[in-house]
Amino acid sequence: MDRKVDVAILGAGTAGLSAMAQVRRAKKSFVLINGGELGTTCARVGCMPSKALIQVAHDLHRREIFDREGIEGGEALSANWPNTMEHVRDLRDILVDRVLANSTDQMGDEFIEGYARFIEPYVLQVGEQKISADRIVLACGTRPVVPPSWADFGERILTSDTVFELEDLPRSIAVVGLGVIGLELGQALSYLGVSVTGFDQQETLAGITDPAARQSAIELMSRSFPIYLGHAVELKEEASQIRVNAGDQSVVVDSVLASMGRRSNLDWLAMENSGVDCDAHGQPIFDRHTMRCGESRVFIAGDISGTDQVLHEATDEGRIAGYNAARDSAVAFKRKTPLAITFTSPNICQIGVAFDDLPADQVEMGEMRLGPVGRALIMGANRGLLRVYAERSTGRLLGATLIAERAEHLAHLLAWCIDERMTVLQMLRKPFYHPSMEEALQGALRDVFPKLNQKSGSADAPPELKALHEPDSSTSV
């Protein structure tokens, strides 16, 4: 059966559902097409089940400091792995059901289950149906990267798509790829009592480019499980287990978690028939402010775009793509300040301009280590550091890298400040409550301020104080 609509949306994940809301709001006819599991990557296999596992793991790990706090019996506590995994799935299912109840469950013939592919520009084949659309939104997501040579190891190779389905946990596991997913799941499994070994071909963790922050993260994460960097891994069968070799290191494990990133599902769409211009890697060339692919009437959104694979960005991209797909001319929208958070202990956060992208001759840096921070000491978490980057000429905050407990909250604060183009002086003049982790940020700002071409209203007054009649122009030079 042939069908004609104003907009066809491929993918019922976060980006696709956000695009659909905009198209529906504009009262355009549409279809939402989805192949595979429903329920968004975040709710089903990403953010939410991982955070459920992390919460249990961190609750259990807290027992490590019970003795010095005068709490007895901590050594007797342990995790019942099958019960833990059932708890994670129960929470996951609640969240997925909420997504479905508010989206595809009530859509009728506007929703089509099946895999779409282009047969010509603006014409899609979905099973026996042919769908013609004036405009198309590509939002069909990604899947974990698993080397083809690992297929022979079968179910012993885990990914973030499969690990939460385990009825029980393996006794030992190698985590290959120490980005956000690998670090979060590796530490959580270690805290739950699994013997974990981590590997990454890169010389960093979680994509950190700031050398001081990178070193701090490596030192602190190595307290949770052994980490080996800088070598590719090779897997070999060894009885019923897997031997993992990387450089001079070798370990035998029950399972391997492949956390080497996610690849786009574009290869399922027959993009060669779409009429969309793609780069050498087959990725559509698009404008990130309109999400429009070249001069076509095709838009792209979410993880499939190859940009930051985080929910708030996927939501925004879906909104932008859906808004523009429902209109004759595309509107360019301002994008949010980059924000990346790894929910390990300590948190690893990167905000604003990345260290490697900073103009070195125009930037000053401030640092605060957590050793003397009172609140961090009380929490038993006074290791790590905060690094902030500011433009020398204006004092404007450009970015930061944080390795600290509860830094997820500081990261939001800094992203908002960068979004508002605030200066270090303006930030120093905000209240910092005692005792709080925010005092660590105050320390980093105090460290960078004297290096900037900024001055307060009175040369001999503390920068935190603003005279009642101080003109605004005195805050920067």
Name these PLM-found stretches.
Residues 8-36, 41, 48, 52-59, ...:
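Flexible, glycine-rich terminal cap/loop adjacent to redox cofactors
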Residues 20, 24, 186-191:
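Gly/Ala-rich phosphate-binding loop of Rossmann-like dinucleotide-binding domains
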Residues 117, 142-144, 261-264, 370:
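Short glycine-rich anion-binding loops that position phosphate/pyrophosphate groups of nucleotides
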Residues 16, 179-182:
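Catalytic nucleophile loop
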Residues 154-169, 251-327:
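FAD-site-proximal beta/loop scaffold in flavoenzymes
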Residues 2-5, 12, 21-28, 33-169, ...:
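Glycine-rich flavin
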Residues 127-129, 233, 245-250, 262:
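A structured beta-alpha segment of the ubiquitous adenosine-cofactor-binding alpha/beta core
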